[in-house]
Amino acid sequence: MDEALRLQARAARAEVEAGTLRGEVLLELVLSIPFLDRDPWVDELLGIEPPPDVPSLPRGSVPYLPCGVDEILAMVRDVPLRPDDELVDLGSGLGRPLVLAHLLSGARCHGVEIHEPLVRSAKALCSALHLQAVTFVHADASESELDGSVFFLYAPFNGEMLARVVRRIEAVARRRSIVVCTVGLELRDVAWLEPRSSSNVSLSLYTSKVDRHG
């Protein structure tokens, strides 16, 4: 990313901090950035720094890797995410998906992350941007009570941990209709999820089909 784009992102960050850059205007700005520069540009916009060191990975979790901006844009558009939604990111990392999704949609956002250094960084980012509707908690998603209308997973778990997380999400689906969004993770074998179409080849969408009257 060249210096002109970096300066543009920093100028836009001031508008985000002031609460004046949101929604469609922000979306048009992000889409105007060349594809290969889009991820680092958004990180500069949001003030996301390189990830801090994290301790050894618990069994069933995977190393931190941020989700691509285009997958986030597709998720916001395809769900579609609205101001009355609550988006929950399981394995939320430094917060790129949640912060960008909130700025674009106005939805309340909540992240669950097992690595405390990443949680501290994500909280500091939201504080700097004055975003009170985006929160993060240090917790094991497979052991947490969950709630929300939209769930996002960027391949954060595998094996038995993933199975436990899916059961936690199913418990929410038994109370309310939800949408589950995944990147790099297929859940087509989960009986209570109905696959939906997606505009991005890496993004999978599912609607819950749990009998909430049984």
Kindly label every feature range from the protein language model.
Residues 108-113:
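Conserved SAM-binding motif I beta-strand of class I
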Residues 1-82:
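S-adenosyl-L-methionine
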Residues 160-210:
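C-terminal substrate-binding/active-site "lid" region of AdoMet-derived donor-dependent transferases
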Residues 95-99:
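Glycine-rich SAM-binding Motif I of class I
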Residues 149-162:
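A short SAM/SAH-binding and catalytic strip from SAM-dependent methyltransferases
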Residues 122-123:
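Conserved SAM-binding loop
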Residues 84-93:
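Conserved class I S-adenosyl-L-methionine
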Residues 130-139:
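Conserved SAM-binding strand-loop segment of SAM-dependent methyltransferases
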